[in-house]
Amino acid sequence: MKSLIFGYGQTGKSFENYLKNKNLSFDIYDDDKSKLPGVHQEKDITPSFNNLKDYQDIYISPGVKLENYLTKKEISNLNLKSDLDIFFLEHNSFKIGITGTNGKSTLAYLLEQALNHSSSAIALGNIGNPVLENLNHQNKYSVIEVSSYQLDKMENNLFDLSIITNIEPDHIKFHGTFQKYKEAKLKICRDHIKTIFCEGHDYENIATRIAQDLEPNSSYENLIFSLLPHRLEEFSGRFIDDSKSTNSSSLRHALSKLKFSGVLIMCGDPDKECLSEINIKGPNRVYIFGKHREDLVKIVKHQNIKDFATLDEVLDDLKNLNDSSKILFSP
């Protein structure tokens, strides 16, 4: 019997490579047919239960919300597989899962460095390195950044160690409520898995302490960390790139940490967090751009706001500034 890959983003493509390597037959479905390889564009697959029930396995991408297509009972009668569940069964490394609303990418990046200082590790998952593309890696540790979307699809929790950086409202549009978002996040500590709940934002210290616990016979005195790209990264003297920021709590942290008083550039969909108001304190100007700019202008509270259709328009306007204010890009 054939299998189906449901969703053709980065994870969907890793499913494709995985199934090809096993010489298994499969179809691919995505709401956007233009993304699919040519042979799969020709197939007319409607995501109804009658069409899906005949597939042996359905490899489900994290961002797919099956409830938009099927009832809960219908979903329960399908054989769903996530990339995490496959990796748990097919790789024998020590698996560290890291999740949280903010800081998970930073901590995964730093913990990978700390463990490579004393042993061998690779950062995988939501950090941009799909787990299924790394089934053959030989490192002792897999440091896996996982989103609420991925945890929502995970059937069995087989992490050896779980870490939660923090939980604040986010992705409410996908999960429906903050409570359901929290429940998805907390799946990472289900089944009596040892879990670390982080306190504060000193992720270099947290990463070092975790590495010391795992590799107690190693010294970390000479460890020098490199920082995660696009996370409060300064360049050209006045620009600060915080484009890894994806929610309002991350923005608040950046403004607080920097004690920022320059120009803030922001964009995004406020419905993602069900936001009704964003108070911006510190910057002397706020530039808002993108397709959701009108929605953001309504809820951002600041005395000096300008909105633009595109980032290019923002950059053109910045050329007219007569001062040397720092510019924070935190979309």
Tell me the role of every PLM-derived stretch.
Residues 138-202:
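Flexible active-site lid/hinge loop adjacent to a nucleotide/diphosphate
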Residues 19, 58, 98, 126, ...:
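Residue-level signal for inorganic ion chemistry
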Residues 1-97, 229-231, 298-300, 308-319:
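Short, basic phosphate-binding NTP loop
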Residues 26-30, 122-123, 143:
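Short beta-strand "acidic-cap" motif of Rossmann-like dinucleotide-binding folds
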Residues 27-31, 197-199, 265-267, 282-293:
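Short internal beta-strands
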Residues 14-18, 120-121, 203-285:
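Nucleotide phosphate-binding/pyrophosphate-handling subdomain across enzymes
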Residues 83-127:
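Walker A (P-loop) phosphate-binding motif
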Residues 38-39, 270-326:
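C-terminal helical cap/extension that packs against the catalytic core
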